[in-house]
Amino acid sequence: MGTSSPVTSDVALLERVAAGDERALWELATRHGSDLRDLAFTILRDPVDAERVVQSTFHEVRYEAARFDPGHFPVDRWLAELTRVGALQLSRSRSGYRSVVS
């Protein structure tokens, strides 16, 4: 009979990130980074930019984890939304897109 360690939930990891646990942030990045890079690459079509967006996403997670509401979004969806917004912002800044506010 093998031993296995329980998988820490994403919500529990975010709670630990909010408390300053860098290892929890690393675990979230390891768990979700590949999917987030794929998402960013789909938008940007550049692997270097995609990696930058994902790094920026986890930098934002470090500071926004305490505000996360697990009743509003699953963690993976929240991470994907942060990544999507970051990728779109980068894409727009590179294309000269300007938002017009009246």
Where would I find each of the regions flagged by the language model?
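Short, structured helix-loop boundary elements
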Residues: 11-14, 22, 26, 47, ...
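Sigma70-family region 2
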Residues: 18, 45, 55-72, 93-95
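Structural recognition of an alpha-helix C-terminal capping motif at a helix-to-coil junction
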Residues: 38, 52-59, 63, 73-85
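A short, charge-rich alpha-helical start-of-domain segment used by transcription regulators
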Residues: 15-38
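Extreme N-terminal regulatory/targeting segments of RNA polymerase sigma factors
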Residues: 1-12
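Short, charged, intrinsically disordered terminal tails
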Residues: 91-102
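Amphipathic alpha-helical segment used for protein-protein interaction
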Residues: 8, 19-22, 101-102
